[in-house]
């Protein structure tokens, strides 16, 4: 059976090439919103962090109807760190729309997601977006995209893909640059003509592969997947087959069934082959599980998800200021929250450690883990994390292997020398260098993942904010040797109390301060950064001794340099292997793992003697 009235597509793109805006426009022009309805920009990015950072983290499901054909659209993340989302979502669709910026052209994450789509033999429609930009170069971008297809071993059918030119912001698409157009109709028509309709046997045994998990506090866990064969009905008895252990089968009942319409889930009594549905009523449903008929339960193979490459320890905050600002502070709270994240994030790994209060959390990159940390912080959690470390492997001969990444950098010509020097120091190897438009140079490096830990902030400083850096995981390669991360030491408070202007004034001569007057500090807390390689202990709580001629009012004459406020990413980049980042809903504090100065010195002596 072929469902000619349905098309299932994923929209894939490099970060910030406009795919979420494109989906917004398709929603508007298909009549999802009332004419007088106020519509937020990027309505598909519902998560606060997504809106703030302008990125998509979680894949979203929506549906529009065009000329009696229902088009299920899935907006996928463009970041390689959230590749786990992309890989499994592609199993639900019959084709993809690849969105490429008309100026920037084919970029690294484009390569990452496109490779996954081509491996699954999905047909591709290429949408050259932002053609209204004055510096747009659509003809050159077409050549770049076709070159990328060839590099990724696309077959002849995939190479013969249609190109659509669009401006999602202005709401039009066209098949040729010379055409006149004021709507997205050419893109709608191309989707219906080129993307195959879903196929399956309506009368066969039911098979639904669960590709994503949603959660609703009223109905609990909701599994989302495509019906490959058979039908689903409300109150139907089915069997849930676990993808880890196919022999582990459980009889369950479907309490509610939904299809997607616009941005909403609509309750239905029955759904058939090709439909993307949401199912509630199954408490322990997981990503990768298959819902089957009880008569013949056969699991659908699950797309292998790329392994994590970076890990950090999440632990209970044990600083002297612990428990004062957070709502959830115990190891039980921390454990429950991390385990809950595993329900919806297949790329994440959480392991217990020897220490009851510490958990090893592994992910696909610094961004992946920093988004989790930021979400937990906003929910009221208080905890501490260690420096990110890469996950090593060994080959058959026992040689150490480490994750390697391809790093693409676009910088103004005058900064390229400094970037090459910095990345060479971090074991990066220059693979390619070419001039691009507007006085920029494009650099391509092969570099260990650990060489990029803590580099992004340095990169923005070196390029005065004008550089663009993108990375994509390549493969595991031979260990490249030790890397020296931070050349500056820390300013460490050696007395607990409140920071005072006089103490800060004396301390600022030693380096850059991270705190201001009135802030609470404790012994072992890092209050700033020195200009030299070694750590320096300072007393920021020091007060001036008063005399008849010296009164405390003379403190007002002391001028403090404004403190340097670190964002979460900057703080994660800054910390060294012997330091922790204390995270609370109100503050980020950096501290030494060993707070006692005497014990810390002994530990350093032992480390240096090894």
PLM regions: where:
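Structural and coupling elements of P-loop NTPases
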Residues: 1-610
């Amino acid at each position: 059976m072929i469902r000619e009235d349905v098309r299932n597509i994923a929209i894939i793109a490099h970060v910030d090439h406009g795919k979420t805006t494109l989906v917004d426009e398709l929603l508007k022009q298909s009549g999802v919103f009332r004419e007088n309805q106020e519509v937020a920009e990027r309505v598909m990015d519902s998560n606060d962090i997504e809106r703030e950072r302008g990125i998509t983290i979680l894949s979203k499901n929506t549906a529009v109807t065009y000329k009696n054909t229902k088009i299920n659209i899935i907006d996928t993340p463009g970041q390689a760190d959230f590749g786990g989302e992309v890989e499994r979502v592609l199993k639900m669709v019959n084709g993809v729309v690849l969105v490429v910026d008309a100026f920037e052209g084919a970029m690294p994450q484009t390569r990452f997601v496109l490779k996954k789509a081509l491996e699954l033999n999905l047909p591709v429609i290429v949408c050259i977006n932002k053609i209204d930009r004055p510096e747009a170069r659509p003809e050159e971008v077409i050549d770049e995209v076709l070159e990328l297809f060839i590099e990724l071993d696309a077959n002849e059918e995939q190479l013969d893909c249609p190109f659509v030119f669009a401006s999602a912001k202005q709401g039009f698409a066209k098949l040729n640059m010379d055409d006149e157009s004021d709507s997205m109709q050419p893109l709608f028509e191309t989707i219906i003509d080129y993307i195959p309709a879903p196929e399956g046997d309506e009368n066969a045994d039911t098979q639904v592969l669960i590709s994503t998990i949603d959660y609703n506090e009223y109905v609990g866990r909701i599994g989302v997947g495509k019906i490959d064969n058979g039908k689903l009905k409300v109150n139907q008895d089915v069997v849930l087959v676990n993808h880890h252990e196919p022999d582990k089968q459980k009889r369950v009942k479907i309490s509610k069934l939904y299809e997607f319409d616009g941005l909403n889930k609509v309750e239905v009594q029955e759904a058939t082959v090709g439909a993307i549905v949401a199912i509630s009523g199954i408490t322990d449903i997981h990503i990768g599980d298959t819902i089957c008929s009880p008569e013949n339960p056969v699991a659908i193979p699950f797309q292998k998800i790329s392994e994590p490459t970076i890990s950090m320890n999440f632990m209970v905050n044990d600083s002297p200021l612990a428990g004062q600002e957070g709502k959830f502070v115990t190891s039980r709270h921390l454990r429950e929250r991390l385990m809950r994240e595993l329900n919806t994030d297949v790329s994440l790994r959480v392991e217990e450690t020897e220490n009851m209060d510490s958990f090893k959390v592994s992910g696909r990159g610094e961004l992946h883990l920093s988004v989790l940390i930021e979400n937990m912080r906003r929910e009221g959690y208080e905890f501490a994390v260690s420096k990110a470390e890469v996950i090593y492997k060994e080959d058959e001969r026992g040689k150490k292997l480490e994750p390697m990444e391809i790093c693409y950098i676009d910088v103004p010509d005058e900064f390229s020398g400094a970037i090459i020097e910095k990345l060479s120091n971090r074991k990066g190897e220059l693979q390619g260098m070419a001039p691009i438009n507007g006085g920029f140079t494009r650099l391509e490096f092969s570099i260990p993942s650990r060489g990029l830990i803590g580099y992004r902030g340095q990169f923005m400083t070196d390029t005065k904010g004008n550089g663009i850096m993108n990375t994509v995981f390549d493969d595991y390669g031979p260990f490249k040797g030790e890397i020296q991360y931070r050349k500056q030491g820390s300013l460490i408070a050696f007395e607990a109390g409140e920071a005072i202007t006089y103490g800060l004034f004396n301390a600022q001569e030693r380096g850059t301060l991270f705190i201001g007057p009135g802030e609470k500090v404790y012994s072992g807390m890092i209050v700033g950064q020195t200009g030299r390689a070694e750590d320096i202990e300072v007393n920021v709580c020091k007060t001036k001794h008063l005399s008849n001629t010296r009164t405390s009012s003379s403190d007002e004459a002391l001028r403090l340099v404004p403190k340097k406020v670190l964002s979460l990413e900057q703080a994660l980049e800054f910390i060294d292997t012997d330091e922790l980042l204390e995270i609370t809903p109100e503050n980020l504090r950096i501290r030494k793992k060993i707070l006692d100065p005497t014990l810390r010195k002994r530990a350093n002596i032992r480390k240096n003697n090894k």
